[in-house]
Amino acid sequence: MRYEAIGFDLLTALLDSWSLFADVAGGRERGMRWHAASQSLLRGKPYRPFEDVIREGAGVVGIERSKAEELLGRWGEAAPWPNVPDVLPRLNSYTRFIVTNCSERLGAVAAASAGTFDLVMTAERAGAYKPDPRPYRAALDALTLHRKRVLFVAGSAHDVGGASRAGMDVYWANRGRVPAPTDATAIREEEDLRGLLDMLEG
């Protein structure tokens, strides 16, 4: 077996957090602008509480504070993408872990919606937000895994770069069909997780 462990991004690779943002914001376009604003506030920035980032991101795009509190209260409602419940049980022979930009509390709530994992490494615990390599490395250290024996399932282009810089091979579930990053290359790119099984079994 080439890999002994598989890591996952949580909020894009496993869960459809975009639809939750859209539902709370009152529309897909508004929700995606909120999501993007929140991402821009944490990416490459010093760590600060994730909940504050969500609140500030709402303000950036003109969404009222009460909506941010509603989103945080409904965090556990983010549902797995349709193929996730079929794929994850077939990976039980691997150590499975998550690396997420969530806080400890929100990470635990959201991960429970996705499945069962050996570790949920949050940005709060690592003291840095992805794509900084520290959260990925913290997960590897916590599970005493060698990076070359781990495949990471990225949810975003930034995740591809972050996980690659931490030394892992990357499978990219490019659900948004966005352009490939310029700083790293996934060993396989698909629109969902179905290609993951083919790759591991091939």
For every predicted segment, state its role.
Residues 26-29, 62-67, 91-95, 114-116, ...:
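Short glycine/proline-enriched coil/turn segments at helix->beta-strand junctions
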Residues 1-6, 85, 89, 97-202:
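Asp-based, Mg2+/Mn2+-dependent phosphohydrolase catalytic module
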Residues 35, 76, 89-92, 201:
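Alpha-helix boundary recognition
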Residues 24-27, 49, 64, 92, ...:
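Serine/threonine-rich low-complexity intrinsically disordered regions
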Residues 2-82, 103, 107:
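N-terminal helical cap/lid subdomain that shapes the substrate entry/recognition surface
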